């Protein structure tokens, strides 16, 4: 399974979610609160999301960083707003979707192994993906052969070394 990011589709995705939210609010919110809730969603999906996800050769990202620093002086503010930061955010969101997929596969008795370090340019060409698409990870799926790994015994860092209770 190949997990693909499509930051280039942010406008269509925002519009899709906005339309859903308008109907959702009309169906499930008290009539007295509907107008404000719809207005809030229109601000978020109609203006903020397009502003955050738009790309313009780094110029818009630099402006967003300055704006975030200024607003951050007055109130809590998400600071990761540069074009690079937004690309990282898109990839983290996709990785969370991949994680959910892998957990679901395990629940069905299948094993998965997320892969990084592949030739993304060739992979995009092979899959005929558009220029704006990015490959987040490749996840082979199957059933393990007992407890052995591909080349022998499996090795894991001890749990106590990577988990710290606060």
Walk through the language-model features, giving the residues of each.
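Acidic, surface-exposed loops and disordered segments
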Residues: 1-166
């Amino acid at each position: 399974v190949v997990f693909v990011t499509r930051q280039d589709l942010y406008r269509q995705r925002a519009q899709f979610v906005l339309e859903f939210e308008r109907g959702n609010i009309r169906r499930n919110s008290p009539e007295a609160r509907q107008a404000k809730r719809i207005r809030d969603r229109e601000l978020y999906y109609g203006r903020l999301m397009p502003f955050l996800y738009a790309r313009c050769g780094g110029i818009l990202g630099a402006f967003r960083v300055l704006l975030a620093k200024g607003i951050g002086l007055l109130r809590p503010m998400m600071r990761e707003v540069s074009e690079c930061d937004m690309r990282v955010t898109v990839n983290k969101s996709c990785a969370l979707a991949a994680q959910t997929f892998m957990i679901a596969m395990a629940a069905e008795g299948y094993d998965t192994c997320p892969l990084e370090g592949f030739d993304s340019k060739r992979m995009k060409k092979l899959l005929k993906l558009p220029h704006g698409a990015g490959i987040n990870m490749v996840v082979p799926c199957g059933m393990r052969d007992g407890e052995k790994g591909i080349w022998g015994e499996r090795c894991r860092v001890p749990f106590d070394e990577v988990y710290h209770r606060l």
